[in-house]
UniProtKB/Swiss-Prot annotation:
5-phospho-alpha-D-ribose 1-diphosphate binds at residues 170, 195, 222-230, 291. Residues 1-86 are annotated as: Unknown. It comes from Chlamydia muridarum (strain MoPn / Nigg). The keyword GTP-binding applies. Catalyzes the conversion of uracil and 5-phospho-alpha-D-ribose 1-diphosphate (PRPP) to UMP and diphosphate. This is Uracil phosphoribosyltransferase. Uracil binds at residues 285, 290-292. The gene is upp. Binds 1 Mg(2+) ion per subunit. The magnesium is bound as Mg-PRPP. Gene3D superfamilies: 3.40.50.2020. GO terms for biological process: UMP salvage; uracil salvage. Its cofactor is Mg(2+). Its EC number is 2.4.2.9.
């Protein structure tokens, strides 16, 4: 019992520390539209309980991001190669960008090519905890009666929503411990995706999912959202097994990957720690952090 109490208190301290350090930071909710060629200023979306919202501007398939606390280059303007009339007409899912100073600091440590695997793993775990914290803030609660050491009290308690975290192998494994630190009772699935380095097309080589996944809130974790091909294929595979409530958690993403997920799966919400500029000719994120799987496992030069 003492061990459990210590674990809970340690987790709460981490959350309180993160909340205190987020003063003055900002979060952005992104929505795409692909209609007018003129810039259109959107009214702030309903306030998400983290901090102040920013304004979003969209131009056809291009988007520009303005933030009060961060440089405007957080998300660069881009033009999609996808024809406007072929994009989904359904409402596009929200994308939440975390701009917490501690997360941004640790993301910079991940980017540094001189960061060793041990520190890389620790930072990835800590960032994942922060992203999980934001992604789970809408979980349903109900009041239950409990006996404290002093009195009987009605206290909020999770309603019993089943949660599954699914890492995309192998880099996604580095995000699991951070997620489980906050949601220790979550089930863990596994999906392995490999990418053809010439065509950049994904293929699945492993799929181990809970039998009751249709009744679960599924959180897919993968550090990198580059072309979006692997993430889209993973989401599709999970849906084929019956999952309906899916959230995607990433550390780094680029506009191309976000657009791909919003086009293929407009019902999936994305939480990302940091937005990068673009992809290079090899479909690697720039400035990025290199190959997250290699750096996590120490299997190659991080450059």
């Amino acid at each position: 019992m003492h061990i459990i109490m210590k674990t809970i208190l340690a987790t709460l301290c981490l959350i309180l520390c993160a909340s205190c350090c987020s003063k003055g930071a900002c979060e952005t909710r992104i929505k795409h539209t692909f209609s007018e060629k003129k810039f259109q200023k959107y009214s702030p979306v309903p306030k998400h309980p983290l901090s102040e919202q920013t304004h979003l501007y969209a131009k056809s398939c291009s988007i520009e991001l303005e933030q009060t606390q961060l440089p405007t280059s957080t998300l660069t303007r881009y033009v999609s190669s996808t024809p406007t009339d072929s994009l989904s007409s359904k409402p596009l899912a929200a994308v939440y960008v975390l701009s917490h100073p501690l997360i941004q600091h640790k993301a910079s440590l991940l980017r540094n090519k001189n960061t060793k695997s041990k520190i890389f793993r620790e930072c990835l775990k800590e960032i994942s905890l922060g992203v999980c914290y934001e992604a789970t803030r809408d979980l349903a609660l109900k009041n239950i009666s409990i006996q404290t050491p002093l009195m009987q009290a009605e206290c909020p308690h999770l309603t019993g929503t089943k949660i599954v975290v699914i890492p995309v192998l192998r880099a996604g494994l580095g995000m699991v411990d951070g997620f489980l630190a906050l949601v220790p009772n979550a089930k863990v699935g596994l999906i392995g995706m490999s990418r053809n380095h010439e065509t950049f097309q994904p293929s699945s080589y492993c799929c181990k999912l809970p039998e009751d996944i249709a009744d679960c809130h599924v959180f897919i974790v993968d550090p990198m959202l580059a072309t979006g091909g692997s993430a889209s294929a993973t989401i599709q595979l999970v849906k084929e097994h019956g999952a309906k409530n899916i959230t995607l958690l990433n550390v780094l993403a680029v506009p191309e990957g976000i657009e791909r997920i919003q086009k293929d799966h407009p019902d999936v919400t994305i939480y990302v720690a940091s937005l990068d500029e673009k992809l290079n000719e090899s479909a690697y994120i720039l400035p990025g952090l290199g190959d997250a799987g290699d750096r996590l496992c120490g299997t190659s030069n991080p450059s």
